[in-house]
Amino acid sequence: MVKWVYMNEILFAEIYYICVAIMLILGFKTYRSMMKNSQKASFLAVVFVHILYFQTDLVRMSNVQNLFLNEMSFLFFSLCTFSWFNYILTMLEIQYVKKTQTLIALIPLIVSVVLLLMNPLNGILFKIDQNANFQEGPFYLLYVFINDLYYLVGAYKAYVYSCRAKNYQQKKSYQILGIYMAVMMIVGTLQDIFRQVPIFCVGTSLSILIVYISLEEQMISIDPLTQLNNRNRMEQHLFECMRNADANMYLLVLDVNRFKKINDEHGHAQGDLALKA
C-alpha cells in the first residue's frame, strides 16, 4: 500500500511538471512573439498563474491534511479563472473605462477571497477531518459557481462578438476562445468532483496549447511553400475591398484540372516545383 501511494506521488509529480514545462514553453514563445503588448501581458499572466496553481496543487496532494496549502490551491484556482476572463476581454478588445465596470468584473474573485479568509474560522468552504479526508462545506458549491461565472460570461461574450465579427478569420478566432471557455468550465467541474486526480492541470494545459496553436495559425498569411498569400490573407484583402462600396471588385479564380496527377506520376518534389511556378 505504501509503495502504491509512493508511485502515485511520482506519477502526479511527473504529470504536473510536464504541464509546467508546456506552460513555460508557451510563455517563452509568447514573450518572443509579435502580438500586441496588451495581449502578450494578459497571456503571460495566465501562464504565470497556472504555473503557481500547478505547483501549489502538487504540494497539496502530498500534504492533504495541510489547511493552508488547500487554501492556497483554491486561491490560485480563482486567479486562474479570472486571468483567463481578463485574457478573453483583451482578445475581444473590451476595455472597462468606468471603475464600476472593473469592480463588477472583480466581484467573483473578491467573494472567493472573502470565503477563503472565513473558511479557517468556520469551515464554510471545506474542512479536513482527523482522517485527512476533504469534506465540503455549506458554501462550497457557491464557490464553484462564482468561479464558473468567469467561464460562462467569457464564453458568452466570445459567442456574441463572433456573431458581430467583421470577417471570417476574426469570427473563427472568437469561436475558438468561446469553445475553450466552455471546455474549461467542464474540466473545472470535473476537478471539483474528482479532487485527487489532476484533471484541471492536464485539461487546461492541453486546451491552452490548442488555443495558442489555433490562434497562431490564424495569424499566418504566407504559404510556406510558394511564399504567396494564403487563404487567410485573401479573406483579409477581400474584406478590405468590400468595405469600399464605391470601387469595383473583380475576383479571378483559376482551377487546374488533374494537378494531383503530377504528384502521382513525377513525385511530390516535381509537384511542388509546378505549384511554385
Predicted region positions:
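Extracellular-loop-to-transmembrane junctions of the mid-late helices
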Residues: V5-C19, M118-G154, Q191, V197
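Hydrophobic alpha-helical transmembrane segments of multi-pass membrane proteins
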Residues: A13-M34, S38-N63, L69-N86, A105-G123, ...
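Alpha-helical transmembrane segments in multipass membrane proteins, preferentially the mid-helix core
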Residues: I25-G27, S83-Y87, N147-K166
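Membrane-interface helix-boundary motifs at transmembrane edges
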Residues: T30-F43, L89-Q101, S162-S173
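Non-cytosolic membrane-interface motifs at loop->transmembrane helix junctions
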Residues: Q65-F74, N131-P138, I199-G203
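Signal-transducing coiled-coil linker helices
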Residues: Y161-L225, N232-C241, N248
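Hydrophobic/aromatic micro-motifs used in signal-transmission helices and low-complexity FG repeats
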Residues: L225-T226, V256-R258, H266
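Conserved long alpha-helical elements within nucleotide-processing catalytic cores of c-di-GMP signaling
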Residues: R231-Y250, K260-A277
